[in-house]
C-alpha cells in the first residue's frame, strides 16, 4: 500500500522545499496532495499553478516553507513552449474547442524573429477566460466552461528573453524568460495572431523559478518508488532548506538580544544593515530564523519568522 491510497496517515511537522517535476495530465493541486501524503506533512502549498498539460518545475513548500512562498510566487520564471500553427483555440491550448483554422504563411527565420521582437520587453496581456483569475469570486475558467465571457483588464508583464528554438511548417518552439503573472498560452496566442495564422500550445515545460532550475527537479514517480511506509522520513533528503527560497536577499547576523526582540515582533536597529528592502535574518548561532524588512527609520521589522520546533 502506498502513501497515495493509505486510508489514515500519521502527519508530522516537516519543513523544506521540494522541487517537483510535475507530470503532464495532472493539476498542480493533485501533485501537491500526492507529495503532501508521501511526506506525511501536516502543511503544504505550492508556489504558482501549472496547467494540467504542462510539466516541469513546481516548488512544493512543506511546513514553515509555506511562510516564504510569496517570494517564489513573485519571482521570474522560464519555460520552453511548443505551439501548433494555423489553429487557434478557446483556451490557447489543445484542451478546448477550435475557434479558427487558417493557412500558415511561408515562414522564414527572419520573419519569425521580426515578429518575436515585438513581444520582448514590457508588453500588455489580456488574460484568457481559461485562467484562474477570479471575477466576483468565480474563477474565469469556470465561467468560460458555462459559455460566459467577461471583460478582463490588460496587465503589463515583462518578457526578458524570447528565443526561437525551432520551427517547421506546422509548429514553433520558443524559450521564454518572463516576469510573474505572464500567461504563456496568451503569449503564444498573441504571437500566432501576429503571424496571421493563429497558434495554440501543445507542450509547455517550466524550466526555472527564481534561481531554482530543472537540474534540481525530482520526479513524482521517483518519490513514489522511494517511499517506504515504515521509514517515510527517508524522502526528507530531497528537501531543500527554507533559506534557499530567499537566498537572493542580503543576510544580517543578529546578536542574541536583537534576535530575541525581533522574535517578539519588535523592530530593532542593526548596525551596518542595508538601507531598504528585505533581509535574511540569522541568529547569533548563524541559524536562519526568517525574513525582515528595513523600515523608513532604518530599523528592521520582522515579516516572516520560523517557528522553532
Curated annotation (Swiss-Prot):
GO biological process: mRNA pseudouridine synthesis; tRNA modification; tRNA pseudouridine synthesis
Residues the record marks as active site: 51 (nucleophile)
Gene3D superfamilies registered for this protein in UniProt: Pseudouridine synthase (3.30.2350.10), PUA domain (2.30.130.10)
Domain of life from the UniProt record: Bacteria
Enzyme class: isomerase
UniProt keyword terms in alphabetical order: Isomerase, tRNA processing
Tagged with keyword Isomerase: yes
InterPro entries associated with the record: PsdUridine_synth_cat_dom_sf, PsdUridine_synth_N, PUA-like_sf, PUA_sf, tRNA_psdUridine_synth_TruB, tRNA_sdUridine_synth_fam1_C, TruB_C
Family annotation (CDD domains): PseudoU_synth_EcTruB, PUA_TruB_bacterial
EC id: 5.4.99.25
Catalytic activity reported: uridine(55) in tRNA = pseudouridine(55) in tRNA
MF (Gene Ontology): pseudouridine synthase activity; RNA binding; tRNA pseudouridine(55) synthase activity
Pfam families referenced in this protein's UniProt entry, alphabetically: TruB-C_2, TruB_C_2, TruB_N
PANTHER family, per the entry: PSEUDOURIDYLATE SYNTHASE TRUB1, TRNA-PSEUDOURIDINE SYNTHASE
Record's function text: Responsible for synthesis of pseudouridine from uracil-55 in the psi GC loop of transfer RNAs.
Protein family according to the UniProt entry: Belongs to the pseudouridine synthase TruB family. Type 1 subfamily.
Protein name listed in UniProt: tRNA pseudouridine synthase B
Organism: Coxiella burnetii (strain RSA 493 / Nine Mile phase I)
